[in-house]
């Protein structure tokens, strides 16, 4: 098959011949009531799902991964609290009525879901970004508004804010798992790989954040939807989803990179390329876009526009329009150069190992760290281990997925790896990696080819999730 037309083959092969329009007499005999016709239109999407085995598999696999992983999360979180208590008090992050104060059972159920940054989202959902709330106003703007707005909207229906946040996260996770399955099936042409990718996502070591009052699941659902829409050439939807992702997290801005890459270079299913593949014609020809810019590319401007609207809204309210970006300094992040945190993280991990092996009770080998020397050293080793684990997945993604996926991972990692924190250069890296679904797709493709490794690796990943969740539920910092 001609490679220039191969991208159009899948949708063309799946198309069914259009049914002929019924004759006028038959149309006159249609005696369905308006309510029956409306019901038929509403049930059409469900009928399409039932008619497509790929969609049926996506629904079944994503649902199984969702309920089994979340059951493990709540059982492990509640069990940890029952066994060890709620852990050390963190008054600044544990205000009454926000993450606690719901009675014995309510506090127990909130333990796996409402910790640390959850308080920021819940406070924003209630108070917004009012500039009269003291010194924490700028720090609050690091948390973008869409997720707390969702919490507030659900709370209007009568739900407590913590429950509203959990429901929002679970709904977004369900959509994200379904989208990952569909996207993996499209890119890898394998139901086994799609199923494995879904379970890799649901049982990742930090996947308990997906059902916590955190924005990870919402951002994941929006970014997966953006890629699916871009592959199918729905550029208005790409712009809207990109804007919503940017309104969820500042890293949503980097989604403009893969969106542009898919627009200009493909692969795309909406139309054939305007130029043939470069082949062996050399670098200049290889860099030439395969698709010409058209008016629909303007939809991509919605992605950066969302960040501008957020800044303008803060400024109109009497705040600082650049506060969302200046707030990174308050959180200890500073620009040190592109990907400099990789080298700094290696140094912190090495010194952390020396610290642990020295059995010293003071910061002997890494004085930049704060708090317990043992805890700080262990964290730096753990963070660097996550970085090392991401490397083979990134290499595999570069071999098996379109280039736009790899560009997305590299662009998204440029933010945490270029803005390190002094005591922990790779702080929060596991959460940044958690939402980079191309790594999950790559891992799923590998597990599909090595079925004997599937259960041991997924079991080990689930065990790590339980360990990290136990720390999170008892107010120990994880990521």
Can you describe what each PLM-predicted range is?
Residues 301-304, 449-477:
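Signature aromatic-anchored transmembrane alpha helix within multi-pass, membrane-resident enzymes
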Residues 211-218, 429:
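Short acidic/glycine- and proline-prone juxtamembrane loop motifs at membrane-interface regions
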Residues 179-182, 200-203, 218-237, 256-259, ...:
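Specific aromatic-rich, kink-prone transmembrane helix
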Residues 137-145, 149, 157-175, 374-384:
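Loop-to-helix entry region of an early transmembrane alpha helix in multi-pass inner-membrane enzymes
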Residues 112-130, 136-159, 342-347:
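Short hydrophobic/aromatic helix or loop-helix immediately within or flanking a transmembrane segment
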Residues 152-153, 167-187, 389-395:
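Transmembrane-helix motifs of polytopic, lipid-linked glycan transferases
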Residues 160-164, 180-203, 220-221, 237, ...:
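Transmembrane-helix signature of polytopic, membrane-embedded enzymes
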Residues 72-90, 113, 256-389, 404-409:
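Membrane-lumen/periplasm interface segments of specific transmembrane helices
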């Amino acid at each position: 098959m001609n490679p220039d037309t191969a991208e159009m083959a899948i949708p063309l092969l799946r198309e069914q011949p259009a049914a002929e329009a019924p004759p006028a007499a038959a149309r006159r005999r249609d005696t369905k009531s308006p309510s029956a016709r409306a019901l038929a239109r509403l049930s059409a999407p469900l009928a399409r799902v039932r008619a497509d085995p790929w969609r049926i598999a996506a629904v079944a696999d994503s649902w199984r991964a969702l309920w089994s992983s979340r059951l493990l999360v709540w059982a492990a979180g509640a069990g940890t609290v029952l066994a060890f208590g709620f852990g050390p008090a963190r008054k600044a992050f544990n205000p009454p009525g926000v993450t606690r104060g719901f009675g014995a059972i309510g506090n127990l159920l909130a333990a796996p879901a409402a910790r640390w940054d959850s308080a920021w989202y819940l406070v924003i959902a209630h108070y917004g970004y009012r500039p009269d709330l003291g010194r924490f106003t700028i720090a609050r703007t690091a948390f973008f508004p869409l997720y707390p707005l969702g919490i507030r909207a659900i709370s209007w229906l009568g739900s407590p804010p913590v429950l509203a946040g959990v429901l929002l996260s679970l709904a977004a996770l369900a959509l994200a798992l379904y989208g990952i399955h569909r996207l993996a099936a499209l890119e890898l042409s394998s139901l086994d790989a799609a199923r494995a990718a879904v379970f890799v996502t649901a049982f990742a070591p930090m996947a308990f954040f997906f059902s916590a009052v955190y924005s990870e699941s919402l951002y994941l659902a929006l970014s997966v939807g953006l890629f699916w829409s871009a592959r199918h050439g729905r550029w208005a939807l790409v712009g809207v989803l990109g804007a919503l992702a940017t309104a969820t997290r500042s890293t949503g801005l980097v989604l403009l990179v893969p969106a542009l890459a898919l627009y200009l270079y493909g692969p795309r299913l909406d139309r054939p390329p305007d130029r043939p593949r470069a082949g062996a014609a050399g670098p200049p020809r290889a860099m030439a876009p395969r698709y010409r810019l058209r008016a629909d590319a303007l939809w991509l401007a919605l992605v950066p526009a969302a960040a501008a609207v957020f800044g303008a809204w803060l400024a109109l309210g009497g705040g600082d329009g650049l506060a969302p970006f200046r707030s990174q300094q308050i959180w200890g992040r500073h620009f040190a150069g592109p990907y400099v945190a990789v080298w700094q993280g290696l140094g912190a991990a090495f010194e952390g190992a020396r610290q642990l092996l020295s059995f010293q009770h003071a910061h002997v080998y890494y004085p930049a760290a704060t708090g317990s020397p043992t805890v700080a050293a262990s964290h730096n080793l753990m963070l660097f281990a996550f970085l090392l684990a991401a490397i083979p997945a990134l290499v595999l993604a570069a071999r098996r997925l379109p280039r736009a996926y790899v560009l997305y991972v590299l662009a998204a990692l440029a933010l945490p790896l270029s803005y390190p924190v002094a005591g922990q250069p790779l702080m929060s890296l596991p959460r940044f990696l958690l939402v980079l679904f191309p790594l999950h797709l790559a891992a799923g493709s590998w597990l599909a080819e090595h079925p004997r490794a599937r259960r041991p690796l997924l079991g080990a990943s689930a065990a790590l999730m339980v360990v990290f969740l136990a720390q999170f539920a008892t107010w120990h910092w994880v990521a």
